Amino acid sequence: MSDIADRVKKIVVEHLGVEEEKVTENASFIDDLGADSLDTVELVMAFEEEFGIEIPDDAAETIQTFGDAVKFISEAA
């Protein structure tokens, strides 16, 4: 797993209190990991802070899974 993926996974595990094994590429933050809309906003803010990037609102709405987050951050960082 890439450094970006490792860092994203750590943020997801810490913010959502889920087991690391549940955070897979296609794991939906809401459907699979139990996040609500506030959790997803907090995740986006944590990604922005961790990676020093800005995620516009329209892009944030497309980040629904762990894989989406890793892909977006990899392209933006």
Swiss-Prot record:
Cell compartment(s), UniProt: Cytoplasm
Posttranslational mods: 4'-phosphopantetheine is transferred from CoA to a specific serine of apo-ACP by AcpS. This modification is essential for activity because fatty acids are bound in thioester linkage to the sulfhydryl of the prosthetic group.
Chain positions with O-(pantetheine 4'-phosphoryl)serine modification: S37
UniProt-listed Gene3D superfamilies: ACP-like
GO biological process, alphabetically ordered: lipid A biosynthetic process
Domain Carrier span(s) in chain numbering: 2-77
Pathway: Lipid metabolism; fatty acid biosynthesis
Molecular-function GO term, any one: acyl carrier activity
Keywords in alphabetical order: Cytoplasm, Fatty acid biosynthesis, Fatty acid metabolism, Lipid biosynthesis, Lipid metabolism, Phosphopantetheine, Phosphoprotein
Role summary: Carrier of the growing fatty acid chain in fatty acid biosynthesis.
Family to which this protein belongs: Belongs to the acyl carrier protein (ACP) family.
Record-given protein name: Acyl carrier protein
Gene designation per UniProt: acpP
